[in-house]
Amino acid sequence: MLDTELIPAAEPDSEWLMVVLHGLGDSMEGYRWLPGALRIPALNTLLVNAPDDYYGGFSWYDIYNNTAPGVERSRDLLFDLLDQQRADGFASEQTFLFGFSQGCLMTLEVGLRYPYKFAGLIG
């Protein structure tokens, strides 16, 4: 299970969601400013920490060895997270994936392989 924090939209009952995936060595803390900067009142923001510790931050996969197993594991964890978001009322058609660096790779990996279409992929 991934560590997450939902920053609710200013508009009550909004079903629009942006899932934010940070880069190597960062964390969700590095993106707390994003909802305020975007100023989109209908947008809920889900900040997500990658699963692996990395020098005080987090990593989505091992950059020094074979990356494939880590990418696959993180993809599966993100699929589970997105399935839970769908169950909680956030349809994938109203969900954006946003990623930077390693988070961008995961955005593309998940966005192109998840069985449901997203509103958009941002990297």
Residue ranges and their predicted role:
Residues N44, Q94-F96, G120:
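Proline-centered loop/turn at the N-terminus of a beta-strand
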Residues W33, E109-R113:
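Active-site signature of alpha/beta-hydrolase-fold catalytic machinery across serine-
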Residues V20, G99, G123:
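Conserved SAM-binding loop
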Residues M1-S92:
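Serine-hydrolase catalytic machinery in alpha/beta-hydrolase-like enzymes
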